[in-house]
Each structure stands twice: as C-alpha cells, then as structure tokens.
Amino acid sequence: FVFPFEKYDQKILKEAKKRPIRHLMINTNGIKLAQDKDFVRQLAEFKPGLEIYLQFDSLDDDVLLQIRAAKLAEIHNRALENLNYYDISTTLVTTLVKNVNDHQIGDILEFAAKQSCVRGVTFQPLELAGRVSSFGLENRITLSEVRRKICEQSNLFTLQDIIPVPCNPDALAMGYG
C-alpha cells in the first residue's frame, strides 16, 4: 500500500495496519522528516512493515537545484539522521538525468551503504512527462547505461550482479549487494 507523504494521516496507517496489508510505503521528499523528529518517532510506531521511499537525486545542492529547483542536500541528511535514529526501513530513490546526476551513481551507492536505515537504492531514469519541462531527449538514460555506470562508478557490483527482471527486461533490473 503506497500513498504520497503530502497526504499523510496517521488514521490511514492505522486503518491499513488493521487489514491484511503487510507492507506500507510512504513516498516523500524528506522535508517533514528532516524538520520534525517527533513525527519520525510516530512513524516508527508502525514498524515493522513500514518503509520510507525517499527522493534522493544527488548529494550536491547545485545538481538538486537543476532537478528539483531546491537545495535539498541538508534536508535529506537531516531526514536520514532521524530515520537512522529510529531505524525506519528506507529506500533512496534517484531520478537519473543524463549529464546532470548520472556521474554521481557511485557516490550515492557509497553514501547509502553508510546509512543504517537504508535497505536499498532505486535508480529511475528520467521520464519526460508531466512536470518535466527543463530536460529533453538528450537527458534520457537507458537501463543498459545505468547498469554500466553502476559498475564503472562503484566496486559494489559487477554487470553480472545486476540482472534484468524477466517480466520487463528492457525497463527493470535489480542487484543485491
């Protein structure tokens, strides 16, 4: 069960926990998690079975300004401090934009490996739809390029470790490290 963090309401989580829903995932940019440690404590009451899906496009504010039009590096760091403190399962979610943040894949993986709450990193290639207007086709990155860059920028994986998912091998791949 997934819902956007902006719509967060403890009643939703309480109702979901009463049902046969084993895993709750909250999508967030991390702002509230960074600003309100007590709020993170309240979220921790829903463990196990709660996961934070944290927008995490870069470690660099200059890059974040290009992608999100906001300086979010310190926000993300504070959010992760709070999530680490309460050991809330977290996935970092990186929208990859070719020639903007694709050179930081290795840095993001290394950073994630140092966070006790982080259970995974999801790299999502830029989708040219909706609000995306400042990027073009030259900023699209393919799954093959992502796999290659992971291996080039980090010693955590080899190409053999990152395997295409059979149900959609052109769009999905996974690796465990």
Locate each region found by the language model:
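Glycine-rich phosphate-binding "P-loop"
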Residues: 1
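Radical SAM/AdoMet-radical enzyme domain recognition
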Residues: 6-125
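Radical SAM enzyme [4Fe-4S]-AdoMet core and its adjacent flexible, acidic
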Residues: 85-177
